[in-house]
Amino acid sequence: KTFTLSRRQQKIERTHEKKIRAVDHLSFTAYEGEIFGLLGPNGAGKTTTLRMLATLIRPDEGDAMVDGISVVKQPDQVRKKIGFLTSELKLEEFFTPSALFDFFADLHQMDGALAKQRKQELFARFGIEKFAEVKVANLSTGMKQKVSIVISILHDPNIIIFDEPTNGLDVLTARTVTDFLMELRRQGKTVILSTHIFSLVEKL
């Protein structure tokens, strides 16, 4: 994937090149019941790779298959198969976790009874029950991340793509997220994540 740089970006990157290639000739396979990690420093192309897998940006060349479905030819079908957590996700601060869950459950066309049960399970798993009716603006950074994770997997996808899932979190919240990732693996899910934290990779 190649991006065109503005003059300001060229100055920041200290380059005269007008284009930068973020990802080139990348190939890997992630299996069921596996946590596949992309480890590298900021700017290594991890987020770009995950965004292409999640069909948020289109590769200039080549293709990727998600559960046998092309991200280039059938992006809508791919989105139904995955749960995607991006480090750039900004929750609407005037909504509550409960309202956000209901909104995204409707987007995924979930049955009402199933959505209610799923909300109870996930809110209990991440300790969100007491904050279900609190506006996002009043939540801690860790609680916002928990809500983001719940929203990304509320439709129970088999393929989970997390971009820097523990970035900026306190130790206890990071441990909760790490334990959940291992739980997803035990359930036979495919987990693909990016991180620049080597200790996280060692734990997983």
Region locations from a protein language model:
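Catalytic Walker B motif of ABC-type/P-loop ATPase nucleotide-binding domains
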Residues: 160-163
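Conserved ABC ATPase "signature" region
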Residues: 102, 106, 113-131
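Hydrophobic anchor residue at the start of the ABC signature
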Residues: 149
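Helix N-cap at the start of a conserved alpha-helix in ABC-type nucleotide-binding domains
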Residues: 171-173
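Conserved ABC ATPase signature
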Residues: 135-139
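Helical segment within the ABC ATPase nucleotide-binding domain
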Residues: 175-187
